[in-house]
Regions:
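Extracellular loop and loop/strand-boundary signature of outer-membrane beta-barrel proteins
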Residues: 93-96, 122, 133, 173-181, ...
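Short loop/turn motifs that connect adjacent beta-strands in outer-membrane beta-barrel proteins
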Residues: 25-29, 37-55, 141, 197-218, ...
Length: 390
């Protein structure tokens, strides 16, 4: 993730801070690039979408954010009593459900942008003092195209709920609490959207504020999403006792889908010749069902040995096709050079598969078969943003 963070920063710094300076030279390569960045769509109907000259913008934001995962497991195993009586073996199964969730974080943020580009940084305030947070975002939001990169790294105690049915006559266990040591929850998301109606609809009008939607319009969207998620906690913590010392879960997914986005404009007042007097209120609702074509889940387990160091075992599950969901809603009010926006989003990513339990985990009484795993990563956020254009 460290290399990913450096790459993300370079992606933003080069176009945002270098291009505007070089763009002053006539007919230069950089001038063509900045034109593509700041005014990528020459098909805009100016009666429906008002795109002012590109400007620098600065926005501060407050956000509520929560991310977590829930997982269900089923384990097949053969139990042979080791009581000297020669009892018959039994084919049994055990099951568990685990829910890991970070708390609702209060986040402050700063976004700096030029034209359709912006770089964001967020930081958790208040809450658990053991929490640490790194959150970066890079957005390229044009009227008809969108590319958004988000990276979250939260380290904090993890709330858990677990239910375990062991099979045979070993009973049932239920527990909930918080890990003693901070766990880590990391997410990298890359979203790309293409709007089929690029003449009268501007996706960036609500979520970037760089253009103004003059009248209501909607469009069908095509979207691509990449997700890489990680949940990790201390191997000596209570959670690692659940399933063979499992203390780390990773998922990687690539999804494609189509949906619909609509901008509703209940009020608009055009600016005067001096550029002042702009008043605009726009609402957006976006829904994109997606099919996950690449769906990989891996778990890392630690096996304590009677002698020597613990053994680490990593199992990789290549899951089946799944339907995931992306929902987003927002509103923005613009007046002259200022704007205030609210937005909310909900992302859900499913995974499912099975893997064989390593032979080292079996003993004289218990021979393990396969673990069947299904689960989901979820993330929601709600934010308020206040910005100004220079």
């Amino acid at each position: 993730m460290l290399d990913l963070r450096k790459t993300l920063i370079l992606l933003v710094l080069l176009p945002v801070f270098c291009i505007p300076a070089h763009a002053q030279r006539p007919d230069s390569f950089w001038r063509k690039v900045v034109h593509l960045i700041s005014d990528p769509s020459m098909e805009l109907d100016t009666g429906a979408v008002y795109q002012p000259a590109p400007r620098w913008s600065v926005a501060v934001s407050g956000e509520l954010h929560q991310a977590g995962t829930s997982m269900e497991n089923k384990l097949d195993y053969v139990f042979t009593p080791d009581d000297g009586a020669g009892g018959d073996s039994e084919l049994l199964d055990a099951s568990s459900s685990i829910r890991l969730m970070g708390g609702v974080d209060k986040v402050i943020g700063l976004q700096v942008g030029y034209g359709n580009l912006s770089l964001g940084w967020n930081h958790i305030v208040g809450g658990d003092r053991a929490s640490t947070n790194t959150s970066f975002s890079f957005d390229y939001l044009a009227p008809g195209y969108a590319l958004q990169l988000q990276y979250f790294d939260f380290r904090r105690p993890i709330d858990y709920e677990m239910k375990i049915a062991l099979g045979h006559d070993w009973g049932y266990m239920e527990d909930s609490g918080k890990t003693e040591k901070p766990g880590r929850m990391t997410t990298f998301i890359a979203d790309a959207f293409y709007a089929f109606n690029r003449r009268t609809f501007a996706y960036s009008a609500v979520y970037k504020g760089n253009v103004i939607q003059r009248r209501s319009a909607g469009t069908w969207l095509f979207g691509v999403k990449y997700l890489q998620g990680l949940v990790e906690y201390d191997p000596d913590d209570v959670l690692s006792d659940l399933w063979f010392g499992m203390y780390r879960q990773d998922t990687r997914q690539v999804s494609f889908g189509g949906g619909f986005s609509y901008n509703l404009v209940p009020f608009h007042r055009q600016p005067g010749a001096d550029g002042k007097g702009l008043r605009n209120l726009t609402f957006n609702l976006t829904a994109i069902p997606m099919v996950t074509l690449f769906n990989q889940f891996s778990s890392t387990m630690r096996r304590e040995m009677e002698e020597g160091d613990p053994v680490l075992v990593k199992n990789v599950i290549n899951g089946k096709l799944h339907v995931n969901y992306v929902f987003k809603a927002g509103a923005i009010y613009s007046w002259d050079r200022f704007f205030v926006g609210v937005s909310g989003s909900y992302d859900r990513y499913n995974y499912r598969g099975s893997t064989a339990v390593p032979e080292d985990f079996s003993d004289d009484e218990v021979e393990f078969g396969r673990i069947y795993t299904s689960g989901r990563f979820c993330r929601w956020s709600a934010s308020l943003k206040l910005g100004v254009k220079f």
